[in-house]
Amino acid sequence: MAHPDSSIIPDSVQSEYLFYHGRPYGSDALLGPLEVLLNKGFAVAQFQNRDRFIFDYNYGGRHVWKSITDLRGSVQRFGGWNEVLRTEVLPTSFEWKNWKWAPNYIGHVFEGGVTNRKIEEWYRVHGIPMPGVAAFLTTMTSAVINEMYSHPGVNQGSASTAMDLLLFDPLGILLFRHDRVSRFFSKRLGARIWSGQAGLTPSGELVNNGNNLILKVPLSLIPGTSFFTRAGLAFTPGFTFHGTNGLDVSFGFGAEGRIQGIDPMTGEEIPQLAFGGGVFLDRQGSLLASVLASEVEHRRLVVNIYPGVIPVLGGRFGTWFILRESGALRFGVSARGALGVGLGGGIN
């Protein structure tokens, strides 16, 4: 396994980087623009009712266009501005059916903002001109792909999509441009992004992707532990136990996204949840391995081992497999330096 202090970022400037630390192992080793596009842009592929053959897909491009250019019509179909503000923007109700504001802040503002800041730091380390602009384009492209992929074949706009693209996604980017905000989330809340080892099969199926916001909040009453939360299309709270050399073990159990329904009249997203959770091993915030189990049919058991863990060919490669309820198996490899795009295969 790679040395815990190894990094492509010199020690003299490490403090300037809050979410990307250039670790040549774990999830850090897979970061790149394609990794963001596949893991964030297609995050809802984790729902079991999503078609994961992304090269032959009826994307909702017209839906996104109409949501942005016909905002008035989109809001009217949703029930008016009062309804939009009550359910999408302001936490005025804690009834489950009115909790749409929660994923807007957690997924689009916080997870999206941290993702943008992380890829901006990656661009800066790799000498990409105007890293802030490059990160903005990468993150917003992922956000647009997410909405197009979430609304296949939908031609009319929706207030939900408009709020995501015009308010919450830009708000997250702007918020985490501020060093004070990013430092608070990174240092005080232990915020990280743990992404899947996204793979493409020869038939064009996208597998094993996902983008999750991780929080580790230290528990002063129990030394060496933190309150752990994994959020994205899941919410699995638990605990982290801090070991030596920056090695942490985390446990989290709760809800996993199972089905994403779309209201044909309003374009409103209606998720269904299932029980799930997992165990996670990371070093210095870079995810090394994870085991996830859930009631979601197409990912009953998911095992990921990231680059730098298996000492074969210099620890360059990672591996993963997914067991489905039907007994079908998906498996694949990832590679450090491949910008987050791996090769997958399967047995049905």
Where are these regions (language model features)?
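Membrane-interfacial alpha-helical segments at the cytosolic side of multi-pass membrane proteins
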Residues: F110-H126, L166-S182, A338-G346
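N-terminal targeting leaders of membrane proteins
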Residues: M1-G113, V207-F228, T240-V249, I259-A274, ...
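Short loop/turn motifs that connect adjacent beta-strands in outer-membrane beta-barrel proteins
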Residues: R124-A134, H178-S195, M265-G267, V312-L313, ...
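Long, acidic/polar, low-complexity amphipathic helices and coiled-coil-like
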Residues: E120-E121, P129-P131, G153-Q156
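Interfacial helix-loop-helix junctions of multi-pass membrane proteins
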Residues: S142-L167
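Short juxtamembrane and helix-loop transition motifs at transmembrane-helix boundaries
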Residues: P91-N98, E121-P129
